[in-house]
Design a protein with these regions (language model features):
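An N-terminal-biased, well-structured beta-alpha scaffold segment characteristic
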Residues: 2-93, 216
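A general structural signal for well-ordered alpha-helical segments in protein cores
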Residues: 13, 57, 61, 106, ...
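Short, flexible loop segments at the rims of nucleotide/cofactor-binding pockets, characterized by
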Residues: 25-31, 48-51, 126, 177-184, ...
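Short gly/pro/ser/thr-enriched loop/turn and capping motifs at secondary-structure boundaries
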Residues: 78-81, 101-104, 178
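Phosphate-binding beta-alpha-beta segment of Rossmann-like dinucleotide-binding domains, i.e.
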Residues: 90-92, 98-146, 158-161, 165
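Rossmann-like dinucleotide/phosphate-binding beta-alpha-beta segment
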Residues: 135-224
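Conserved small/polar residues in nucleotide/adenosyl-binding loops
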Residues: 229-231
Length: 231
């Protein structure tokens, strides 16, 4: 099965080549981003493997389908950049990455919170210049602070577990409450209440029509001033 990977980097070539060894896949790597202009490069490829910055709107999908493509394989969990209705009309199947380490994303979110709270980037730059003063670098203890988790799927739950380990109080917002968070003592609130009460807010939700512009200027104004500064 001839497969073309758009927006491919050297690490894509290494990992995909190794994973496809011994299979019936014939992999081809294209560093260019998929657009209406580059879609012609997929002529004769049954499978197009795309990344998050590739264009997969109706005109691009139509050109891919005309060139013989039958499957769009996403190298991402998110699919908000794909016109699914157009894909269905054209008979194009679309698959995505069903899961990846929720711990990696959750841990990265916590690392960013710690870095912002303790001004690590500013402190690093200062010490490189021989300035070891603490002015403007002190943050606050996470212990005892209220953390709002917006989206409590696998990643949000992993994030909540870490913050509970810091001794934080948990608030949550999700249409489907997660029993694991309830067991951690989290309180599910309406989003406006969460925004007002939480000192730190972390978003762990996909981009859909329901979540688009979930955070607006109006919702930012509802947050605590310190929370808006650090998250």
């Amino acid at each position: 099965m001839r497969t073309l990977l758009f927006s491919s980097q050297h690490y894509d070539q290494e990992s995909f080549t190794q994973a496809a060894r011994g299979s019936a896949l014939e992999l081809h790597f294209q560093p260019a981003r998929l657009t209406l202009d580059t879609a012609a490069l997929a002529q004769g490829f049954e499978v197009v493997c795309a990344f998050i910055n590739d264009e997969l709107d109706a005109p691009v999908l139509q050109r891919l389908a005309a060139g013989g493509t039958r499957l769009i394989a996403l190298r991402s969990a998110g699919y908000n950049h794909v016109d699914l209705a157009a894909a269905a009309r054209l008979g194009l199947a679309v698959v995505r990455v069903p899961a990846y380490s929720p711990h990696a994303v959750a841990e990265h979110a916590v690392a960013l919170i710690l870095a912002l709270n303790r001004r690590l980037h500013r402190a690093y730059n200062r010490t490189r210049e021989g300035d070891f003063t603490l002015h403007g670098l002190t943050g606050f203890d996470l212990h005892g602070k209220t953390v709002g988790v917006v989206g409590t799927g696998q990643i949000g739950a992993a994030f909540a577990r870490i913050m509970a380990g810091f001794g934080c109080q948990l608030l949550a917002f999700d249409p489907y409450p997660n029993p694991e968070l309830l067991a951690l003592g989290a309180r599910y609130l309406a989003l406006p209440e969460l925004l007002r009460e939480a000192r730190i807010i972390s978003l762990h939700c996909p981009l859909t029509e329901h979540t688009r512009h979930l955070i607006t200027a109006q919702s930012l104004a509802q947050m605590q001033q310190i929370g808006r500064a650090h998250v």
